[in-house]
């Protein structure tokens, strides 16, 4: 029976037929690998996700974590699943062999982890955050910090978090007030409160390594005065042994709409709940130089943003497959025009409107998965391309695509979940089926790791204008290369290319128009519409790339025919949505800017 988590055939098509990851084994970093080792890793990920993560997805949602004032309790299946995950070695799939990693291509590693996000996004959040934490310290930490904290995280003994937001500041990191007081021994004592910290407390691991943004006294105001600190839940000795509890206290759990299996916490640092060394203050260790914390944390945040897009895609994908399976099995009604009321009912997939909803989901989730894996492939290019120019190009293109890869799947794969519920009808609105939970879980993704609005400001206000517009030029030129290949291919690909070309031209024209007079308030007033429109253009590009990867001689194969039809749908129904959005942007509409608070 086909999996209802992800489509392995789609993953194989994207990785091998389109992205050609097997060619990466010609590069020194991946020379020990082969198509077989890539497939073995995907097989392992699918098996462990199916057997260890998926079975308790509903149970973790119904029995969310509890806190009795002393301990956080989760259902035991979460720990068992995470232990199984640690045994696979997949946490380190993309990391260097020198730190115990499998050194797989990032595209393969991303595909592997998507299985776990589709199976149980809440349980998979713990290793997701831990890996981001470890990657940041590998990039910015000292050798001693790597030995003390990273290696236990990669072994599955320690878990990690990132602590940015504070109750009064939210996403406005310039306004954080947590302070870090320097000590004579070179450590710091931290005092403050952090809010919305996923995985902030639990008993799933021996220790929790918090990465905390704070200010050293006398630091410059705003984001330029933020430093980054390692603050472990339990202090670690020079020999790696665990010592006293640090002065980090769980003040409470947040009770959420979805993602309920992941603890979400309010943490208090330095309130005297514990007294390491006989006094209050959470012991912290500075990462790198003072006042570089935000730049360092963005290393983790950019990784997390692409990971959020992958998680949103996975939730949309599994919801699509489950609604597809239901539509094939659920008999109801008869074809339009049927005259015999005694005729047998047909499966609801026979009804055109149900097929419309399924086709919309397919176009969203398969387009989003292509984008996520394309970005992972860019990371491989950034790290291993032989030419410096190719590495720099991959880095810039990935920078431009990051806010889109975070936000487009978070919006449109959530729409896919909404359609999955609709396909099931009343049954989809009940807890008897998974699709309502997938919607609730996915609703977080347009919010965390930078809201939709923040990503829109990042795309239009920074990524498209940086380096004198080099990001915009590279994106449109890269799409233009695909368009040219499609024109040369002829047939339907050429026709789709013509439609995409006209829309890409509007991206360039509208971007220049918005910044024509340098007024940031007016330029950014409708940034969310810009993000959505450019996101649709990028997904149309992903679909054109997939069409070009389909072999013409296999046009009759149902998988290939389905891909072509989904591409047609996206170009016919979705891409035209960008027209009114670009019209709004081109007019530099002031409606939202001119609205006054007292008019509401």
Set out the residue ranges of the language-model regions.
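A structural-propensity feature for long, helix-poor, extended segments
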Residues: 131-133, 142-145, 149, 448-451, ...
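Amphipathic, small/basic residue-rich leader segments at the start of a protein or domain
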Residues: 1-125, 148, 584, 590-600
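C-terminal amphipathic alpha-helical interaction region
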Residues: 466, 481-600
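Internal maturation/activation junctions in enzymes
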Residues: 65, 126-130, 141-183, 376-395, ...
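Alpha-helix capping/hinge segments and adjacent helical runs
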Residues: 2-5, 259, 374, 396-474, ...
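A short core secondary-structure module
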Residues: 187, 191-245
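A glycine-rich, basic-preceded beta-loop-alpha segment at the flavin cofactor/substrate interface
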Residues: 196, 235-251, 256, 266-304, ...
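C-terminal helix-coil-helix/basic helical segment that borders enzyme active sites and/or dimer interfaces
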Residues: 366-405, 511-525, 546-558
């Amino acid at each position: 029976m086909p999996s209802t988590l992800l489509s392995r055939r789609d993953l194989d098509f994207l990785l091998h037929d389109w992205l050609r990851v097997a060619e990466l084994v010609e590069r020194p970093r991946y020379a020990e690998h082969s198509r077989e080792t890539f497939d073995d890793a995907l097989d392992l990920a699918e098996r462990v996700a199916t057997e260890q993560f998926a079975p308790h997805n509903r149970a973790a949602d119904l029995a969310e974590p509890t806190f009795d004032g002393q301990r956080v309790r989760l259902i035991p299946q979460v720990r068992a699943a995470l232990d199984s995950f640690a045994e696979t070695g997949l946490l380190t799939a993309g990391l260097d062999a020198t730190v115990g990693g499998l050194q797989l291509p990032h595209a393969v590693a991303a595909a592997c982890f998507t299985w776990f996000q589709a199976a149980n996004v809440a349980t998979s959040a713990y290793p997701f955050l831990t890996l981001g934490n470890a990657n940041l310290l590998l990039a910015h930490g000292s050798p001693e910090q790597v030995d003390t904290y990273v290696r236990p995280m990669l072994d599955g003994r320690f878990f990690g978090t990132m602590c940015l937001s504070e109750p009064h500041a939210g996403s406005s990191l310039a306004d954080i007030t947590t302070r870090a007081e320097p000590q004579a021994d070179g450590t710091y004592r931290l005092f403050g409160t952090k809010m919305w910290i996923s995985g902030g407390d639990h008993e799933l691991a021996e220790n929790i390594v918090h990465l905390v943004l704070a200010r050293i006294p006398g630091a410059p105001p705003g984001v330029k005065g933020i430093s980054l600190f390692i603050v472990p839940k339990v202090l670690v000795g020079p020999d790696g042994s665990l010592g006293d509890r640090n002065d980090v206290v769980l003040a409470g759990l947040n009770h959420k709409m979805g993602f309920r299996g992941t603890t979400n916490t309010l943490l208090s640092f330095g309130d005297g709940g514990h007294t390491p060394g006989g006094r209050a203050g959470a012991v912290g260790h500075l990462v790198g130089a003072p006042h570089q914390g935000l730049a360092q944390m963005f290393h983790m945040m950019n990784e997390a943003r692409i990971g959020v897009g992958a998680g949103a895609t996975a939730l949309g994908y599994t919801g699509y497959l489950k609604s597809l399976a239901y539509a094939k099995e659920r008999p109801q009604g008869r074809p339009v025009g049927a005259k015999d009321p005694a005729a047998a009912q047909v499966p609801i997939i026979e009804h055109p409107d149900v097929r419309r909803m399924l086709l919309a989901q397919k176009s969203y989730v398969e387009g989003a998965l292509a984008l996520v894996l394309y970005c992972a492939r860019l990371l491989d290019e950034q790290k291993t391309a032989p030419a410096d120019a190719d590495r720099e190009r991959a880095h810039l293109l990935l920078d431009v695509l990051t806010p889109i890869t975070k936000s487009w799947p978070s919006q449109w794969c959530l729409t896919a979940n909404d359609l999955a519920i609709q396909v099931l009808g009343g049954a989809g609105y009940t807890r008897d089926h998974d699709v309502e939970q997938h919607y609730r879980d996915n609703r977080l993704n347009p919010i965390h790791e930078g809201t939709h609005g923040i990503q829109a400001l990042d795309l239009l206000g920074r990524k498209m204008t940086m380096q004198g517009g080099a990001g915009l030029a590279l994106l449109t030129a890269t799409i233009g290369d695909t368009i040219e290949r499609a024109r040369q291919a002829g047939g339907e690909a050429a026709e789709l290319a013509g439609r995409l070309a006209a829309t890409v031209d509007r991206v360039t024209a509208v971007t220049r128009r918005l910044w024509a007079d340098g007024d940031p308030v007016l330029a950014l007033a409708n940034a969310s519409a810009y993000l959505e429109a450019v996101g649709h253009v990028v997904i149309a590009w992903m679909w054109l790339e997939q069409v070009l990867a389909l072999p013409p001689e296999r046009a009759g194969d149902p998988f290939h025919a389905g891909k072509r039809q989904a591409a047609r749908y996206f170009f016919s129904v979705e891409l035209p949505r960008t027209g009114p959005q670009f019209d709004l942007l081109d007019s530099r509409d002031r409606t939202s800017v001119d609205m006054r608070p007292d008019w509401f």
